[in-house]
Amino acid sequence: MSFPQLGYPQYLSAGQAAVYGGERPGVLAAAAAAAAAAAAAGSGRPTGADLGSSSTAAVTSVLGMYASPYSAPNYSAFLPYTTDLTLFSQMGSQYELKDNPGVHPATFAAHTTPGYYPYGQFQYGDPGRPKNATRESTSTLKAWLNEHRKNPYPTKGEKIMLAIITKMTLTQVSTWFANARRRLKKENKVTWGARSKEDDNIFGSDTEGDHEKNEDDEEIDLESIDIDKIDDNDGEQSNEEEDEKLEHLRQGEKESFKKESEVMIPSSDGLKSKDSLSLGKESSDTSNTRIVSPGGQGNIQVPPHNKPKIWSLAETATSPDGALKSSPPPSQANHTSPPIQHPAFLPSHGLYTCQIGKFHNWTNGAFLTQSSLINMRSLLGVNPHHVAHHNHHHLQAHQQAPLLATNLSSLSSDKTPERTSPKHSDRENLPRTESPPQLKPSFQAVRENTLSQQEGTSRILTALPSA
């Protein structure tokens, strides 16, 4: 076998030499010499020439594959490099400079400008490319502005038209008109009304309202506007605004001070203690309620039970319960008000808690004694005997209050001899506004409680057999 396409000839026989004789003439000669040598060997008489020729043929046949290894082999099964095929005829050279069309096909148009690859939308030579505002481009804008001096606000459609004519962007056109309007205001002091909203709504302008609201927010043309004057105007406006704010603050402080003074000043309640002044914020001047004792000898002022105001919620939450229930010293002025029972004496219908030491009195209801019946409040309200006991206690307290006042006055007259002078005697004849103190000794309260308990026990003992 031989592979002449790859250039590797092998040992050939006589039959094979005929096959490849037309392709390889050198191989054919070597094959003929080898055949002659074989015939001579078969005859049995080899000669020296035959031996030399046979050895030469063997060496030639062996070295035939190395005879011309680099002699331009013709690979008919593959594409040749020397001849240009019609498939790649339109392709240029692969190793040319980039200034040439390169490997691009001839049908594709290469860049006309060598070495320029645009990143933007337009090229340098494109007439649609936007450019800076010049005198030629702004002449159209000036002409439109002269025609519309009364209303120098172009609509969205007019801006688009002017931008196409002047080859500018919409932002450039809007900025130019804003600066032009500012120049007109400063030079000619021209004032014009607000632009019509109908034209703006037709084209759906979304940025034009900003120019209408405030012209000072637009861009400023530094070449045509005096910056110092603008700064002075801004300073004057800021000073005026600060003065107005100060005036508003002062007026608000005066109004708040008046309201506080109206709340703090009492109408005709006489002398008040600090507790009553603190409670005065919660009450109005005309809604003071008083409680008349059963004896009718004195008036007890009670803090009103109206709706608390907002600023007093913190005080009511933090103040103890005793401060709200304590009543200030009453005055001797007679106020005709209907008798109102104190809320502590009113019957309540809630469940009450008991002390831990008296818990057995609540649980062991079958073993209640007479004293526990007196001191125990029912689960549905106040015991009627308890109400009578409280009324009797307050009646005796008010009857003994003038006696205590006279005793105190006699003691004070003994200690101060100046009170007997005529100057002080005149003052003593005047009606006093001071009220007798409501402080009661503790032993009186204990004695009264024992008396009232004995009366209550007698009433309960008389009521039990009847039941």
UniProtKB/Swiss-Prot annotation:
PROSITE patterns: HOMEOBOX_1, HOMEOBOX_2. It is found in: Nucleus. Expressed in the neural plate in overlapping patterns with other irx members, which all share an anterior border of expression. Also expressed in the mesoderm, placodes and notochord. Broadly expressed in the tailbud rhombencephalon (hindbrain). Outside the nervous system and at tailbud stages, expressed in the developing otic vesicle, branchial arches, prospective heart region and pronephros. SMART domains: HOX, IRO. It holds the Pfam family Homeobox_KN. Residues 198-307, 319-342, 410-467 are annotated as: Disordered. Residues 126-188 bind DNA. This is Iroquois-class homeodomain protein irx-1. The lineage of its organism: Eukaryota, Metazoa, Chordata, Craniata, Vertebrata. The gene is irx1.
